[in-house]
Curated annotation (Swiss-Prot):
<keyword id="KW-0028">Amino-acid biosynthesis</keyword>
<dbReference type="InterPro" id="IPR013798">
    <property type="entry name" value="Indole-3-glycerol_P_synth_dom"/>
</dbReference>
<keyword id="KW-0210">Decarboxylase</keyword>
<protein>
    <recommendedName>
        <fullName>Indole-3-glycerol phosphate synthase</fullName>
        <ecNumber>4.1.1.48</ecNumber>
    </recommendedName>
</protein>
<dbReference type="InterPro" id="IPR001468">
    <property type="entry name" value="Indole-3-GlycerolPSynthase_CS"/>
</dbReference>
<keyword id="KW-0456">Lyase</keyword>
<comment type="similarity">
    <text>Belongs to the TrpC family.</text>
</comment>
<keyword id="KW-0057">Aromatic amino acid biosynthesis</keyword>
<dbReference type="InterPro" id="IPR045186">
    <property type="entry name" value="Indole-3-glycerol_P_synth"/>
</dbReference>
<dbReference type="Pfam" id="PF00218">
    <property type="entry name" value="IGPS"/>
</dbReference>
<dbReference type="GO" id="GO:0004640">
    <property type="term" value="F:phosphoribosylanthranilate isomerase activity"/>
</dbReference>
<dbReference type="InterPro" id="IPR013785">
    <property type="entry name" value="Aldolase_TIM"/>
</dbReference>
<keyword id="KW-0822">Tryptophan biosynthesis</keyword>
<dbReference type="GO" id="GO:0000162">
    <property type="term" value="P:L-tryptophan biosynthetic process"/>
</dbReference>
<dbReference type="GO" id="GO:0004425">
    <property type="term" value="F:indole-3-glycerol-phosphate synthase activity"/>
</dbReference>
<dbReference type="InterPro" id="IPR011060">
    <property type="entry name" value="RibuloseP-bd_barrel"/>
</dbReference>
<comment type="pathway">
    <text>Amino-acid biosynthesis; L-tryptophan biosynthesis; L-tryptophan from chorismate: step 4/5.</text>
</comment>
Amino acid sequence: MSDILDRIIAVKREEVAAAMRSAPLEALKLEASARDLRDFVGALRAKQAAGHAAVIAEVKKASPSKGVLREHFVPADIARSYAAHGAACLSVLTDEQFFQGSVRYLEEARAACTLPVLRKDFIVDAYQILEARAMGADAILLIAAALDTPLMQDLEAYAHSLGLAVLVEVHDRDEMEQALTLKTPLLGINNRNLRTFETSIQTTLDMLDMIPPERMVVTESGILSRTDVDTMRAANVNAFLVGEAFMRADQPGEELARMFF
């Protein structure tokens, strides 16, 4: 695990301990039961069935490697723009310390449109999954580089028991083998190495031979142009998680349409 990932995971464990003291499980369960669910996997499949790219459009203010991506940051406006320009789903950063995200951003983005929403954070404990359900998320991210296989399987089972979809993220073939032990159809291949932050879309292409036909590859990071999109679609990769390219554009939704449609 990289130094930055080590630091993030350590902070997450501290955050979970603090959150459990301030918001007990029973209170969260009540909040979660009051939330409706949107079909995250179904939204992606519907786009693909129509012959379109299935885009998970990210609402992200900043990152540790790139700093602030967008100064004028209004999650509700961004979400509406994505929805109007063909996104299948949203991804919203809720990590505060490293990505300047917020639970409030997820709530605002989801309230502004009808798209299913992924809670983008570093999940290390089942408590965060219940939190995700309570804040209105429809899906969670599990990062193979941060979790051992038994824990990842347990977290997936708990997420599914709450009705949440799971996107499992990998960067290399060993992590892909780990991910393939899960039941989720959504296999995210992160083109960014979390150890070095180097990015190459070849990472996705090099792992396609491992993917069973019933699974859906979601290529993540480094998709910055129409050329990158065309390269992926030519290899039959039709689901994308994109943040930086949209966040740096004057009009995020228009940039989505320009790159994908």
